[in-house]
């Protein structure tokens, strides 16, 4: 039976930071389940904007691992990783507030779904890389997007598949 003493268990900040970094990059499955206090916020935003709950949860899981206090290296904040300018345009005054962040992030996701005719991969690419970048590709369907995916940043290419994988675990 394995019974380590306290001296053999690492608690260094670098080890914790490394795991956190891997989780944030999506290289380790966080196994995240939706904190119950977010469930009603997600259900409300889903009903308000017509975005499936499973997609909202998948974006949150991919973006922040359900950590409302996370900040990306680019400065995106909160559960759905809103940039300050985008957040302000969506009426979000505090991106760390889960209610505001989920409402604003879902509204933004809904706008991308509308802009790109309900094409989920295109909307996700726009959510991650910006709608202008996706529009500049001159494609009008997810199938066409996939044929020119290499023209998007590698982060965005990976983002689409990460969200789709996460969504499958949140579907009922």
Report the location of each language-model feature.
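A short, acidic/glycine-rich surface segment
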Residues: 67-70, 147
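Bacterial flagellar/type III secretion structural subunits and associated motility module proteins
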Residues: 27-31, 35-37, 41, 49, ...
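Amphipathic alpha-helical polymerization modules
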Residues: 40, 44, 50, 96, ...
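Substrate-binding/active-site groove segments that recognize
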Residues: 71-92, 101-109, 125, 129-140, ...
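Cell-wall glycan-active module
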Residues: 1-58, 171-172
């Amino acid at each position: 039976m394995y019974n380590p003493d306290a001296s053999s268990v690492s608690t260094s900040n670098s080890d914790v930071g490394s795991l956190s970094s891997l989780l944030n990059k999506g290289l380790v499955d966080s196994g995240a389940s939706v904190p119950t206090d977010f469930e009603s916020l997600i259900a409300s935003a889903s009903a308000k904007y017509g975005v499936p709950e499973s997609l909202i949860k998948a974006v949150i899981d991919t973006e922040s691992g359900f950590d409302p206090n996370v900040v990306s290296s680019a400065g995106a904040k909160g559960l759905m990783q809103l940039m300050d300018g985008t957040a302000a345009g969506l009426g979000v005054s505090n991106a760390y507030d889960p209610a505001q962040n989920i409402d604003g992030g879902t509204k933004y996701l809904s706008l991308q779904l509308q802009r790109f005719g309900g094409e989920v991969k295109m909307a996700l690419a726009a959510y991650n890389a910006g709608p202008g970048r996706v529009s500049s590709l001159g494609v009008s369907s997810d199938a066409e997007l996939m044929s020119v995916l290499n023209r998007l940043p590698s982060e965005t290419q990976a983002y689409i598949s990460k969200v789709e994988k996460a969504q499958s675990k949140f579907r009922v």
